[in-house]
A protein has these predicted regions:
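Short hydrophobic/aromatic-rich beta-strand segments that constitute the beta-sheet cores
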Residues: 18, 48-50, 89
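Glycine- and acidic-residue-biased ligand/ion/polar-headgroup-sensing regions
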Residues: 34-51
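A short, compositionally biased micro-patch
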Residues: 11, 22-24, 34, 41, ...
């Protein structure tokens, strides 16, 4: 997957998305209030940041190939690509977070879609 985000599979209670994060870029600081998230790093080096508020990301850990990150509902989080190639990961959302068939070619596309969904 070379898109920022591709919703690979969406069920009633679960969704799997593939992501490719550019060099020096990040997922974007966010919080999901209604569901948990599982992230697995398939390829690359990253920094995971998590906390109870966007101003208090008191958990930070370097991760790489094979690492899994569990993010409980209500935790602010971001993942920053620290490597010199795109960061490849997959995300499991429970419940689904994005419309079935979602494809965001770039982070900018994803941010615009999120803005339009909220407002």
């Amino acid at each position: 997957n070379n898109n920022f985000r591709t919703a690979l599979w969406t069920g009633n209670n679960l969704q799997v998305t593939l992501m490719s994060i550019g060099v020096g870029d990040d997922i974007g600081l966010e919080v999901h209030t209604s569901g948990d998230q599982f992230i697995r790093i398939e390829e690359g080096d990253a920094l995971v940041k998590m906390g109870d508020s966007q101003d208090n990301l008191d958990f930070q850990r370097r991760v790489s190939d094979g690492y899994a990150i569990m993010i409980p509902a209500g935790k602010w989080h971001d993942i920053v690509n620290l490597g010199n190639k795109p960061l490849k990961l997959y995300v499991i959302y429970a419940p689904p977070q994005h419309p079935q068939g979602t494809v965001h070619n770039t982070k900018k596309d994803a941010e615009a879609a999120e803005f339009n969904r909220i407002y």
